[in-house]
């Protein structure tokens, strides 16, 4: 396959692998190896077109659930906030993906409605423009970054409020 390790994390099992491709085309894949397994995780076999291979991957619902937990988990474990966690939450909600409340409950020990309200409060109090700017300005194309940076936090809060209201039957 000709994969080369372009970069890797010193703290977690994360690799950026470069593969041969024509100039101007995507040539890097991010590989996260998560050694945290929950009984509620769902997996399926997926075709990864960029590398012409199949892999066993988390379902979208499982992945979204872990993304919802990642923001506060990262803060509790490392004292840091990653703008990409906010962006990922936004992406999953806006694209109409569902999360798995069983995974949320297993990871947090809370009912989904309680956890999402806690997450909403956390984002309101802790996430600021600096968190978003420092992380996303290097991950997104400039036009996309400019378009989303001012509204990202507000939109995520609205999406979470809508979801907590839905869960409460409001």
Regions found by a protein language model. Give the residues of each.
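Structured mid-to-C-terminal alpha-helical surface segments
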Residues: 1-170
């Amino acid at each position: 396959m000709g994969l080369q390790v372009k970069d890797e994390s010193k703290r977690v099992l994360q690799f950026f692998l470069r593969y041969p491709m024509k100039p101007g085309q995507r040539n890097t894949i991010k590989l996260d190896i998560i050694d945290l397994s929950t009984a509620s995780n769902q997996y399926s076999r997926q075709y990864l077109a960029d590398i012409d291979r199949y892999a066993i991957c988390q379902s979208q619902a499982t992945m979204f659930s872990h993304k919802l937990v990642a923001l506060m988990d990262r803060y509790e474990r490392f004292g840091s906030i990653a703008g990409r966690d906010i962006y990922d939450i936004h992406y999953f909600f806006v694209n109409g993906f569902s999360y798995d409340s069983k995974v949320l409950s297993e990871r947090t020990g809370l009912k989904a409605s309680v956890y999402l309200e806690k997450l909403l409060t956390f984002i309101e109090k802790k996430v600021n423009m600096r968190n978003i700017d420092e992380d996303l300005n290097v991950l997104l194309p400039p036009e996309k970054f400019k378009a989303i940076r001012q509204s990202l936090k507000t939109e995520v809060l609205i999406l979470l409020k809508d979801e907590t209201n839905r869960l409460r039957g409001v």
